[in-house]
Amino acid sequence: MTKVAINGFGRIGRLALRRILEVPGLEVVAINDLTDAKMLAHLFKYDSSQGRFNGEIEVKEGAFVVNGKEVKVFAEADPEKLPWGELGIDVVLECTGFFTKKEKAEAHVRAGAKKVVISAPAGNDLKTIVFNVNNEDLDGTETVISGASCTTNCLAPMAKVLNDKFGIEKGFMTTIHAYTNDQNTLDGPHRKGDFRRARAAAVSIIPNSTGAAKAIAQVIPELKGKLDGNAQRVPVPTGSVTELISVLKKNVTVEEINAAMKEAANESFGYTEDEIVSADVVGISYGSLFDATLTKIVDVDGSQLVKTVSWYDNEMSYTSQLVRTLEYFAKIAK
């Protein structure tokens, strides 16, 4: 049994516990978050985006009892002071958003944990993993890795198929992305000074940046410098879609692209020919769900622009990928 600790019990941390409860061989034995335990339990049980937890959670002194099993709860600001060694923690899922650098994340290792998976993009000194794209880059010697971002987990499988089958010369991606906690619910000063994220999240389409296109080079090195992109935050609480416009090294047809995507489908990369909308992907476990109905090609005098589209639940799709990465990472470390 792989013992897991979750540091940071926010959107991703809470959904990670839900997902891990469904995975044989993984057990969450501890959670660390500075928020009051009763508040955390309430937010875990009732979720406006993902629905009510299909199980039981109780709060006791220093612990949650989840489906009859005790999970220790800490409120320690310094991860180096956490009792990971005493608890025999194999992997920490680092979900606070504050410990995204290798040196900071290694505080968990100094506290006695064996490995750390960061639920956010990290520096170039760490391996960035998108499961079923480049997880085989891990050799078991790593102590800290990054699980990339939700958008990179959506983009990477689609980009990998295009690059492997047809070659990508260059491209530009746009994610039409649900709003998140780094935006304001009503107009007001933004903590990072962002004028657009200072505006009410649920009433506007809000242009934003994304590092997903450039970060793809950490997952697929052949694409370094070939992709860029941006984001448009839209008034939905979860459920997003990524559009990739690319110039390929060979001319293709819509049928050839869709066939290649269908052939590549797996637990991380789904394929659909249904005419779905964002509400239909809330709660899916695919990190990326390719939509064959939206593949388009513009051909002018033999020069092509190719548009491919993939859906994702920026919460649960990403969390599912993180848990797959964590499980794989733990196994190769032993």
UniProtKB/Swiss-Prot annotation:
Pathway: Carbohydrate degradation; glycolysis; pyruvate from D-glyceraldehyde 3-phosphate: step 1/5. SUPFAM superfamilies: Glyceraldehyde-3-phosphate dehydrogenase-like, C-terminal domain, NAD(P)-binding Rossmann-fold domains. NAD(+) binds at R11, I12, D33, S119, N181, N314. Its main location: cytoplasm. GO terms for cellular component: cytoplasm. Keywords: Cytoplasm, Glycolysis, NAD, Nucleotide-binding, Oxidoreductase. D-glyceraldehyde 3-phosphate binds at S149, C150, T151, T180, R197, T210, G211, R233. The record marks H177 as: Activates thiol group during catalysis. It is found in: Cytoplasm. It catalyses: D-glyceraldehyde 3-phosphate + phosphate + NAD(+) = (2R)-3-phospho-glyceroyl phosphate + NADH + H(+). It comes from the Bacteria. The active site is at C150 (nucleophile). InterPro entries: GlycerAld/Erythrose_P_DH, GlycerAld_3-P_DH_AS, GlycerAld_3-P_DH_cat, GlycerAld_3-P_DH_NAD(P)-bd, Glyceraldehyde-3-P_DH_1, NAD(P)-bd_dom_sf. GO terms for molecular function: glyceraldehyde-3-phosphate dehydrogenase (NAD+) (phosphorylating) activity; NAD binding; NADP binding. It is an enzyme of class 1 (oxidoreductase). Its EC number is 1.2.1.12. GO terms for biological process: glucose metabolic process; glycolytic process. CDD domains: GAPDH_I_C, GAPDH_I_N. Belongs to the glyceraldehyde-3-phosphate dehydrogenase family. Homotetramer. Catalyzes the oxidative phosphorylation of glyceraldehyde 3-phosphate (G3P) to 1,3-bisphosphoglycerate (BPG) using the cofactor NAD. The first reaction step involves the formation of a hemiacetal intermediate between G3P and a cysteine residue, and this hemiacetal intermediate is then oxidized to a thioester, with concomitant reduction of NAD to NADH. The reduced NADH is then exchanged with the second NAD, and the thioester is attacked by a nucleophilic inorganic phosphate to produce BPG. This is Glyceraldehyde-3-phosphate dehydrogenase. The gene is gap.
